[in-house]
């Protein structure tokens, strides 16, 4: 009757549940439903599914969360004329912090101050020094004395004054400002809100969703999987965001309709032994998570000598698939970054093989060809066959080392980084309905110890 949270592993039908909830809610003649998710890419994929369901377009709005924020802030003139920082990283904010430090003496550098501001002050919505003095700093490893906090708050005031002068606002800060405006003026623009992939949101974003709809029957419907949290550092707690999803307000889906049991087992082994927060004070578990399709081929993982051999192995696997009457359009080749796909793209072009590059909301190439994308872009998609490149300890580490990228992280940040890499590989593997192939060169990823890797020689 009120807020509902539906969680579950990959392929359990969470998004399908959200889509049918949308169709049901739009049967109300007064419906004005918001369907939102974290990325533009997911919104585009969902749009196709909504169209197939025949949901009346005048009854709902479909947008990613940032677009919803900007449209809402513009409509109600919140921070009108301000530029939003941090859509492409934190460099703009760090530059402002460096300006603050040019005239101030402090033991803290710009990165620490930026993180403290975003992860504590903005995250918890601290409005003044008194609130910040009393604020528990969950997840921050460096303890601060009262004197240090007072000093930090003075720097924050200078930082905010500089932003005011430049007419810029931090992205998450704009979420808080807009949320406060809606709550203070008792404005709730939507009759219902549906949010897919809730694990990708942060607390300021969840508070914003809470403010978009009045509390009541069918107000919020949230779907997601805490284990698929692939965006490092995005902390979330429903209770702290004012969203009650405890007890009967939560449901967990456990039957995987997409992947075979052998694929599911390997995917689960990647995240096994790691504590994943259920985002409401408990721990997320994969217990009882089973595949409807019990039989299937186990994922293959092979280590080769170099990048050329890696590309050659992918070509061989593709040939096997085509010989088994699998279409090119049913295959996706993915890597941790687009840079790792350059040689693969060149080989496909040289061989005259049709392909399509998926990058953000753009799809460039032949729709009947094999898809190329990053692991992150695989989110929300599914294929008959998934081929993963660049699978080694460097790109998908199982433990922290003394070098890059761990050298600049504290223990908490290292743990979060490693968890996000596990989640990323879990997401990538579970996009496949039938076959998973993984290849890399160098040291094998320790995340895949459960899979027997074979050294291949193409000489």
Model-derived segments and spans:
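Conserved helicase motor core of SF1/SF2 NTP-dependent helicases
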Residues: 4-34, 40-82, 154-168, 183-356, ...
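Short coil/turn segments at secondary-structure boundaries
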Residues: 5-10, 129-135, 166-176
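ATP-hydrolysis module of ASCE/P-loop NTPase motor domains
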Residues: 78-148
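Ser/Thr-centered flexible coil motifs
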Residues: 145-152, 202
